[in-house]
Amino acid sequence: QMTSMKSEYVTHNFTPIFDQNSQILMLGTMPSPKSRETGFYYGHPRNRFWKVVSDVCGEPLPESKEDKIQFALRNRIAIWDVLAGCEIAGADDSSIRNPIPNDMNVILERVNIKAIFATGTKAAQLYRRHCQPKTGIEVICLPSTSPANCRISYEQLYEAYSQICKYL
């Protein structure tokens, strides 16, 4: 475990991806350094999010940022993160301090979202603590697709993420 990572205050700089047709909202914790570098959600080359979600939806893997946005909207998937800002060391979710939540009503007041999913335990925990009291909507916790979560096989990820299909 790398303990040398310095904690820094990070703010979220991606707009939420959604439109009038979005049916589910998929929430991460916060963009990782790699995602901030690539300028889009789940941007680490070894993050399995885009692969598993496109496989579950029966579509080819979207490559560019524009492809990913179109893919999400076409499949009625809204994408955002639980946090607007926090102190974090690198991409280590367990190091998060002083979290500032995003206002989920930005999406929920405009769109009829049927289910909210968290892409990882920490995102679910932060949502339950900081967002659920305001939204009144439970979150369904999915396993993290981050490269740090290599204990879980692709088959297990696929099975877990298949749950989203019930709502699309």
Model regions and ranges:
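Short, surface-exposed acidic-centric catalytic microdomains
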Residues: 34-95
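Alpha-helix N-cap/helix-start and coil->helix boundary motif
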Residues: 47, 123-124
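Internal catalytic-core helix/loop-beta-alpha segment
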Residues: 74-123
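Short, glycine/serine-rich, charged loops/turns that create anion-binding
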Residues: 31-34, 84, 123, 146
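C-terminal capping/extension of enzyme domains
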Residues: 2-23, 45, 92-105, 128-168
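Short, hydrophobic/glycine-enriched beta-strand segments
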Residues: 23-29
